[in-house]
A protein has these predicted regions:
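Solvent-exposed, amphipathic alpha-helical segments
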Residues: 33, 37-44, 91-95, 127, ...
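Amphipathic C-terminal alpha-helical segment
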Residues: 117-120, 137, 180-198, 213-219
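Short helix-capping/turn signature of helix-turn-helix
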Residues: 70, 130-137
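Amphipathic alpha-helical packing segments from all-alpha helical-bundle domains
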Residues: 89, 93-94, 120-129, 139-165, ...
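Short, basic, alpha-helical segments at the C-terminal edge of helix-turn-helix-like DNA-binding modules
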Residues: 82-88
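N-terminal intrinsically disordered/low-complexity leader segments
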Residues: 1-29, 219
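Hydrophobic alpha-helical connector segments
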Residues: 79, 93-124, 173-180
């Protein structure tokens, strides 16, 4: 006689194909992952490090994902630019102050944020240098720059204009905004070239020295 054991079939574990991690993520999550990898590559090696191979290695994804989500490496670079600007625009358009804060406090909060460690640091400024240096040679990046820069200027104009209105002043708001933005960009460039010559505190004070003769005391 056969024992009962002969009639029991061994259990076979079904192997399930493991889905790659990036395939289980949403399209938006994959886009963000590639953008962050691109930012990291720019911070480390500048524009020369912004290559499909390096970005894909950093993000641990296949090369085809860049083309799928951004059409080209230039499309990804434009998305990186928009992301970098987006972080700054968030504090310009929604500064960390109470809803009933005065225009002066809102403007001061914007200046403080722009020279905080979150933005005024070696990594961030190196990324900006790499991006700025590429604008003139990259049509996709130039297009994105014009869009983001216009929004940036409008945000600064609104903050300056609100102070002027509250104080009954008539100023050339677009011109003052352009002067302010140019100063901020120049200070960032100066700090990148020779950090020992300029501190974040000094850069912040330079902005007030530009604006206070026009708007009056702000601090």
């Amino acid at each position: 006689m056969y024992s009962a054991a002969h009639h029991i079939m061994p259990q076979i574990k079904k192997k399930t194909a493991q889905t790659p991690k990036f395939a289980r993520q949403s399209a938006e999550a994959r886009r963000e992952m590639l953008i962050e990898a691109g930012i990291a590559c720019l911070a480390k090696d500048g524009i020369l490090g912004f290559t499909i191979d390096r970005i894909c290695v950093k993000a641990k994804v296949s090369r085809g994902l860049i083309t799928h989500h951004f059409k080209s490496i230039d499309g990804l670079l434009a998305a990186v630019y928009a992301t970098m600007y987006g972080k700054m625009l968030a504090v310009i358009e929604n500064p960390s102050v109470a809803d009933d804060a005065t225009p002066e406090k809102r403007l001061t909060a914007i200046i403080d944020a722009m020279f905080s460690r979150e933005f005024f640091n070696r990594e961030s400024l190196n990324i900006w240098l790499a991006l700025w240096g590429e604008i003139a040679n990259n049509p996709a990046l130039l297009k994105e720059h014009r869009k983001q820069y216009a929004r940036y200027r409008r945000g600064i104009e609104r903050a300056l204009g609100a102070v002027a209105i509250a104080r009954g002043l008539k100023i050339d708001t677009p011109l003052v905004a352009m002067m302010f933005v140019s100063l901020v960009d120049g200070l960032g460039l100066e700090w990148c070239i020779e950090p020992k010559l300029l501190s974040a505190r000094q850069a912040r004070e330079a902005c007030f020295k530009l604006l206070e003769p026009i708007l009056g005391p702000l601090q």
